[in-house]
Structure formats: structure tokens, C-alpha cells
Amino acid sequence: MGKGDWRQGRVEMPCAHVSRLHKTCVQVRVRVTMASSEEDGTNGASEASDEKEAAGKRRRLGLLATAWLTFYNIAMTAGWLVLAIAMVRFYMEKGTHRGLYKSIQKTLKFFQTFALLEVVHCLIGIVPTSVLVTGVQVSSRIFMVWLITHSIKPIQNEESVVLFLVSWTVTEITRYSFYTFSLLDHLPHFIKWARYNLFIILYPVGVAGELLTIYAALPYVKKSGMFSVRLPNKYNVSFDYYYFLLITMASYIPLFPQLYFHMLRQRRKVLHGEVIAEKDD
């Protein structure tokens, strides 16, 4: 073998070796890439499976929430219907409003207190409504039932009590039936109409009844000192229920117009939407 051949041989041998090494590296890279692709595919499939499972869970929770809300609203509609029938029957039999509250108070207390669940519904997010607004509305009703009418028995026969009872009853039957049919995706037009029109009269009548009832309670509260805390005491605090009721009555002045005009805006929004839909058709 000549010197040139030897040199040529030395050159050819590394090239062959490099070629084999290159092939080996390519194979390794291919295997790594395939392994990586398989891993990515596995991860992707796992993520897709997790998303699907999460979506299924949300769907099940949504169905469960809808089922519970449907049951709740049906129960509340039935409860207030029972109250309405009891009030009509009492008046037809007795011919007077005296004794009416006493005859229905247990049913009223149960269903009005049961409405506290509406605050829970807002807290856990199954109803997209403000917790604060719902809490104020529910607590004001419970306040009227337990801390005014129930606690001050001499005012139970006041005509103002009948005013807010009738207003509440018609309003709640309409409201809960509206929610029920909406959840069932079958809302009759007359229920929708009642929901957005009856409040125009019922809301002011109900507020008037509440204010007049609180006003009628003031002399009894002042005379008895009920729910009041006087000084001196070990906690060094005082509370006068009489003045608390005066402040409560005064709070209706700014709050009532805000809520009432908000409801009027909602009514215009809904009715305006219906007009546009009819024109488009």
C-alpha cells in the first residue's frame, strides 16, 4: 500500500465511522423525538381527559343546582298559594281582617324564614344575584315578621298588616312561579307580564303597609322598652329599639325610590326587548 493509499485509507476509515455515528445519532434523535411525541400525546390526552371530566362535573353540578332550584321555587310557590287561599277563606268565613294574622302566622313564618336559603344560593354561586341585595330584601321581610308583627301582638289586627300580607303574597306567587317556569324553559306570557307589571302597584302598597305597621308599633315599643339595652350594664353599651325603628322607617326614604326605579328600568328593558323582537319578525 502506497503512502497515498495509506493516507486515503486513513481518510476513508474515519468517514465510515462518522457515517455510522451519524446514523446512530439520527436514530437516537428519532427515538427521542418519538418518545417525546408519545409523551406529549399522552399529556395532551390526559389534559383533554381532565378537561372533559371537569366539564362533565360542571354539567352534573349544573343539573343538580337546576333541579334543586326548581324544587325550591315550586315549594315556595305552593307555600304562598296556601297562604293566599287561607287568607281568602278566612275573610269569606269571618267577614273581617281581625284574627287573620293569627290564623296564618305559622305558615307565614315558615316560608318567609325558609327564604334565607336565597342568600345561601347567592353565596355558593348557583344564583347570579348580589348577596347584599338579596340579604337586605330577605332580612327586611324576616324583620317585619319576627321582630315587629310576631313580637308586638297588639298590632297584629292592624289593617296595615293586611296591606303588606296581601302585597307580599301576590308578589311571591308571581315571583316564584316566574322562576319555576323559567328554569323549566316554559314561561307563559301572563306570568312574565305579571312579574314585570304587578309590582308597580304591589311594591308601594307593601311598603306603605310595612311603614304603617312599624309606626303602629312605636307606642308599644316605647312603653315596654322591649329589645332595648339600658345603661349601666357590664358591657357598657346601650340600644334603644324605639329609635332603631325610627331610623328603620327613615331608611325607606332613600332605599325605596332606588329599588323601585331599578325595577322600572328592568321592566322597560324587558318590554323594549320584546318590542324589538316583534318588529324583527
From Swiss-Prot:
Q: Does the keyword Protein transport apply?
A: no
Which positions, given as ranges, span the membrane?
A: 69-88, 108-124, 135-152, 159-173, 197-214, 245-262
> EC number(s) on record?
4.2.1.134
Q: Which residues lie on this side of the membrane: Cytoplasmic?
A: 1-68, 125-134, 174-196, 263-281
By its UniProt entry, which InterPro entries does this protein fall under? Tyr_Pase-like_PTPLA
Where on the tree of life does the source sit, at the highest rank?
Eukaryota
* Active site residues according to the UniProt entry: 203, 210
Q: What catalytic activity does the UniProt entry give for this protein? A: a very-long-chain (3R)-3-hydroxyacyl-CoA = a very-long-chain (2E)-enoyl-CoA + H2O; (3R)-hydroxyhexadecanoyl-CoA = (2E)-hexadecenoyl-CoA + H2O; (3R)-hydroxyoctadecanoyl-CoA = (2E)-octadecenoyl-CoA + H2O; (3R)-hydroxyeicosanoyl-CoA = (2E)-eicosenoyl-CoA + H2O
Class of this enzyme: lyase
- Give the CC-aspect GO terms: endoplasmic reticulum; endoplasmic reticulum membrane
Please report the PTM annotation for this entry: N-glycosylated.
Pathway assignment = Lipid metabolism; fatty acid biosynthesis
Pfam families in alphabetical order? PTPLA (PF04387)
Renumbered to this chain, the signal peptide range is none
Give the bilayer topology: Multi-pass membrane protein
Please list the residues annotated as glycosylated. 236
Enumerate the subcellular locations listed in this protein's record, separating them with semicolons: Endoplasmic reticulum membrane
Q: What family is reported? A: Belongs to the very long-chain fatty acids dehydratase HACD family.
How does the annotation summarize its subunit structure?
May interact with enzymes of the ELO family (including ELOVL1); with those enzymes that mediate condensation, the first of the four steps of the reaction cycle responsible for fatty acids elongation, may be part of a larger fatty acids elongase complex. Interacts with TECR.
Q: What is this protein called?
A: Very-long-chain (3R)-3-hydroxyacyl-CoA dehydratase 1
- Organism placement in taxonomy: Eukaryota, Metazoa, Chordata, Craniata, Vertebrata
